[in-house]
């Protein structure tokens, strides 16, 4: 046997090595011909793009290679399938009770793994509490605060045994005291949600409450303010199946049960304003309450109020005006207010860069409602604007 034949024979003595080499070579070639994606709809996140070679001189080699490593990770061919495979191995083969930072609970419920406040939240939570106090003091008797607990606080028995979770109750108790001491009303929804926990009040695969959970909280607000609540039986109920939320995007468990979105067929108009300064804008685009085109894409919850706009106005069927200062928990809540108010103005500080005093002065609101999940409240870097005078 000549030397060439011996070398060839020795190579084929390592079939596993050959298989791995061919696999990674094929993956490399597939990456070369697969177009980069700007956005992952499944993960609801922006994906890294190829860093410019100019970064070498501008930022140094270390930053360039860090950016390039992240780019390769985000743009690997079949990324969604690799994530799903990893989750399957972790949950089915290794029998883990968490995947992608999500705790896998009973009744197919998913919970975020939140063991305590992170360092940024230890600074943000006091700032946002102070903002609430300042708002309540400037508008005594008008400010209503509703902070919604996470599903894990209502369903602790469904959380995997021994999983340490943030004790939201102690923070909510302190916030209730602070709001009331400052002249506001704290609308505590914890007991109401607990009373209805046998119903479908939180999504299994998403961090939001359902329209049913929001309705029970809305009824509590009506009781607090002496209002007659929206009557669901007087309206046509619509549903959209096949909703996989943010928890599923992280966990990617193969046997996850999809959620169902429920909403009511309401004819009310929604005007989304172009905001360029404090106060009431003049220009806006008028549409309906729901962006039903979103029901055909992955993030179906974004259909409520057309997402998180900086300032919008819902035309209601009642009297008076209310300003809702909110995160996305309010998106499925606000339509119920059409039964009570003529104008429901909605502010989301993620896209509204001003204080509230000019807007409030322009519109002379009867009530203000601050509606956030506690998870968002403790981490929102923009809510401080609610406390800024002027």
Residue ranges of each PLM-predicted region?
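Extracellular glycan-modifying ectodomains
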Residues: 1-390
């Amino acid at each position: 046997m000549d030397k060439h034949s011996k070398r060839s024979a020795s190579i084929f003595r390592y079939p596993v090595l050959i298989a791995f080499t061919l696999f990674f070579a094929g993956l490399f070639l597939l990456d070369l011909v697969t177009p980069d994606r700007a956005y992952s709809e499944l993960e609801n996140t922006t994906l890294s793009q190829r860093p410019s070679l100019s970064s070498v001189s501008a930022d140094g080699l270390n930053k360039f290679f860090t950016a390039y490593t992240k780019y390769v990770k985000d743009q690997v061919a079949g990324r969604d399938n690799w994530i799903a495979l990893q989750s399957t191995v972790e949950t089915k083969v290794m029998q883990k009770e968490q995947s992608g930072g999500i705790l896998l609970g009973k009744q197919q419920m998913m919970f975020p793994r939140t063991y305590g406040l992170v360092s940024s939240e230890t600074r943000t939570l006091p700032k946002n509490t102070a903002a609430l106090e300042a708002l309540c003091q400037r508008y005594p008797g008008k400010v209503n605060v509703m902070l919604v607990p996470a599903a894990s606080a209502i369903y602790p028995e469904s959380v995997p045994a021994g999983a340490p979770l943030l004790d939201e109750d102690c923070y909510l108790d302190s916030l209730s005291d602070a709001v009331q001491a400052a002249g506001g009303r704290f609308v505590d929804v914890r007991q109401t949600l607990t009373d209805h926990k046998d119903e479908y009040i939180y999504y299994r695969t998403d961090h939001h409450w359902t329209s049913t959970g929001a309705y029970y909280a809305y009824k509590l607000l009506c009781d607090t303010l002496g209002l007659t609540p929206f009557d669901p039986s007087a309206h046509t109920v619509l549903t959209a199946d096949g909703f996989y939320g943010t928890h599923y995007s992280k966990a990617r468990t193969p046997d996850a049960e999809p959620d169902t979105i429920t909403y009511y067929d309401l004819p009310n108009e929604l005007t989304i304003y172009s905001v360029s300064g404090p106060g009431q804008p003049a220009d806006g685009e008028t549409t309906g309450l729901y962006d039903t085109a979103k029901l055909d894409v992955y993030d179906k919850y974004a259909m409520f109020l057309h997402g998180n706009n900086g300032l919008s106005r819902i035309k209601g069927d009642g009297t008076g005006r209310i300003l809702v200062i909110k995160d996305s928990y309010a998106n499925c809540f606000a339509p119920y207010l059409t039964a009570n108010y003529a104008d429901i103005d909605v502010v989301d500080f993620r896209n509204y860069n001003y204080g509230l005093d000019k807007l409030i002065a322009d519109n002379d609101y009867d009530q203000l409602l601050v509606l956030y999940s506690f998870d968002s409240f403790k981490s929102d870097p923009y809510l401080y604007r609610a406390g800024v005078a002027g």
